[in-house]
Structures are given as C-alpha cells and as structure tokens.
Design a protein with these regions (language model features):
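Catalytic-pocket segment enriched in acidic/His residues
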Residues: 194-275, 289-291
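Glycine-centered flexibility sites
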Residues: 36-38, 160, 189, 205, ...
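A generic structural micro-feature
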Residues: 92, 128-130, 233
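HotDog/MaoC-like acyl-thioester-processing domains
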Residues: 2-19, 96-179, 243-250, 254-291
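Hydrophobic, proline/glycine-rich low-complexity stretches
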Residues: 1-115, 286-291
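A conserved, well-ordered hydrophobic junction motif at loop->secondary-structure transitions
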Residues: 44-71, 178-231, 235
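Preference for short coil/turn "hinge" residues that link or interrupt alpha-helices
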Residues: 18, 86-87, 93, 99, ...
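Long, contiguous hydrophobic alpha-helical segments, chiefly transmembrane helices and signal peptides
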Residues: 30, 37, 52, 65-70, ...
Length: 291
C-alpha cells in the first residue's frame, strides 16, 4: 500500500511541477534503434527496412521510425517516484501502456537539444494497485512547435489504497433548464420548429416542444468543464455524445461524470423522470480536476 509522509493531499500533488529533461540524437542513434527493433533482421537488403539504417546518399537521409520518439520519455515514470505525499516501492513498477502522438516526421539528426516538458497526467487508485500516467511533450530548443507527445502509464503494484474510494473519481452537476431554453437555443441557428411550435411537436407525437439534443450536450460539457477542468475549456480535446431520450425545456439535468485517466465518462439524466437522456465521453489534455 502506498504510504505518505503526511496525509495524502491531491491539491499538492496536482500543483507539483516535474522537471524538464533534454534529449539529443544523431543518425547513429536512429540506425541503432531501428536495428534494435528488428530492422533488416530477416533480410539485410530489404529496401522497406534498409531506409531506417542506411541511405546511399548519406546517413543524414535515413528515415526515423515513429516509435523512436518513445526514447524521449525514458525515465518519465521515475519522475513519479518523487510525488509529494505519495511514495511507493519502485521495484514493483510495471510499464503498463504507451501512447504516442507524432506531429511531424523527425529528421535523422536533431539540430540541437530537444526540451521534454513532463507533467502528471493521471493517478488512479485501484485498491491493491495504482495507475500513474506521465505525459512528456517534446519541443525543439528555442521553439514553441510541438514535435511529439508520449503518455506513459505505469502499473504500481501494492501502491493502492490512498483514496477513500477505489472507483474512478466521480462528480455530479445539477443545472436546471429554463422553460424558454429551446426558444433561446434556437437563436444559435437551429430553427427546427419541433423545438418551438407546439403544433409541430404534437404532430411528432410530443406533448410540447422538445429541447435540442445539442443544447443538452452543451449543458453536459459545461458541467464537465466546471467540475473536472476547473473552468478551463482549453483542456477539452475530444467530445462524444449519444442522445438517448428527449428533454423538455424546464427539466433539471443531472450530469454524472467519472474521471478515468484522461477520459471523462459521463451520463446526463432528467431528474424529474429519472431517465438517462445523454451519455458519452470527453478526452482532456491534462489532469485538471481534484482527486
């Protein structure tokens, strides 16, 4: 079980700054890496693989395997060994997952040092274990252009039990819609009379005009930004929503959300009818919530 020098403090953990690291590489490093992952291992003159090791016009023309950028995150999990208020046995650490985004092909030789900005992306209590996520974003020195991003996930055996619940961190939000919500939302451009004309609503077999599905989605995402993202909309990366049932203006929307790493799973229900009307997920760029 994880132990702490003091009571586990999520706010202190989230505010903790991990040190930047530097990386540099050349054509030799690129070729050795390619050979290490089996390039030309079956056929030394395989043109599909030789290009990662040799080029007739010079080594500066060899190509870089996309997974080469994973080297920039080496040691990122060990940064987690020094999280304030959270200690664990590093011998029980297992590399559980690696996620990589490459924004442009890398040259065979770095023009200078690469700056790796390292941050805590997630920490989950799994009872007998914990899951730690470290994000490494790599830039060319002196440039704001992001080259690649690694998200390294470690499985920490015996490190669980630090939170009050083994479930993903959960939140609820209870905003009420106004009776004129559909009339107001239609001014954003959706003028379907189903949402404003009682006669059209009756023809569609609804007792009264219904709320736009995208309006309900807006309520839900706003709730997630408030509860999970500490009010910062720039942390939202992707949004997915499935419309399950209709909402009538004036009903209260309860949005329940569960933080799982960098993904927020959510469900929105109508309080008055206890009926699920929307479900989906939101991917965020960093851990902005409280634990």
């Amino acid at each position: 079980m994880a132990t702490s020098d003091s009571e586990f403090n999520p706010d202190l953990l989230l505010a903790h700054k991990l040190p930047e690291t530097r990386s540099t590489y050349n054509e030799r490093d690129v070729a050795i890496y390619a050979l290490g992952v089996g390039a030309c291992g079956q056929d030394a003159v395989d043109s599909d693989e030789l290009k990662f090791v040799y080029h007739e016009n010079g080594q500066e023309h060899i190509q870089v395997l996309p997974t080469f950028v994973s080297l920039f995150s080496l040691g990122s999990l060990t940064h987690g060994l020094d999280l304030p208020g959270f200690k664990y046995d590093p011998s029980l650490l297992l590399h559980g997952q690696q996620y990589i985004e490459v924004y442009r092909p890398l040259p065979s030789k770095a023009s200078g040092s690469l700056i790796n900005k390292v941050s805590l992306a997630g920490l989950q209590d799994k009872g007998k274990a914990a899951i730690l996520e470290i994000e490494t974003r790599s830039y060319e020195q002196g440039s704001d252009e992001l080259l690649c991003m690694n998200r390294t996930t470690g499985f920490l055996r015996g490190a669980g039990g630090f939170s009050n619940s083994y479930q993903p961190f959960s939140y609820k939000n209870y905003p009420s819609t106004q009776s004129l919500a559909a009339l107001l939302y239609r001014l954003s451009g959706d003028y379907n009379p189903l949402h404003s004309d009682p006669n059209v609503a009756k023809l569609a077999r609804f007792p009264r005009p219904i709320l736009h599905g995208l309006c309900t989605l807006g309520f839900a995402i706003k709730a997630i930004i408030k509860c999970i993202c500490k009010g910062d909309p720039s942390t939202v990366k992707t949004i997915s929503g499935r419309f399950l049932a209709t909402v009538f203006p004036g009903e209260t929307l309860i949005t329940e959300m569960w933080l799982q790493g960098l993904r927020v799973i959510y469900q929105t229900k109508v309080k008055e009818r206890n009926k699920a009307v929307l479900s989906g997920y939101v991917d965020i760029r960093g851990l902005s919530s409280s634990l």
